[in-house]
């Protein structure tokens, strides 16, 4: 599993070099970090105010992120220097912060530390879903583990 994660991190770093400017803004520190929502075919998910999809890392423990070092180049932590704010369907009562390395505050939602994915682009905004244990979150704070819709039964009788 660790080797798989390292390979994915390396692949993500390569993709980062090509796609980092895609959103024109990273998920770095902001005095008024805003968490909002956006609708996709698999549900309403959390995004930044600039539209970047937010993810949780299933391997995180409260206050102890599993993603460190090079992993953070691929999965940047959503940081804040002030109190995070909710917009859209996001709930202010579920927002919080966790102190990470260097005393930096990482935004949390329903206890989950939030990350963006460096390889997401405007044309593929949820490409990190399911990679290495990272998942998008619903407005209730639940992880969404599948972004594919189930096909409807055929009406042709076959």
Region locations from a protein language model:
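Compact beta-sheet-dominated domain cores in extracellular/mature segments
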Residues: 2-9, 16, 21-158
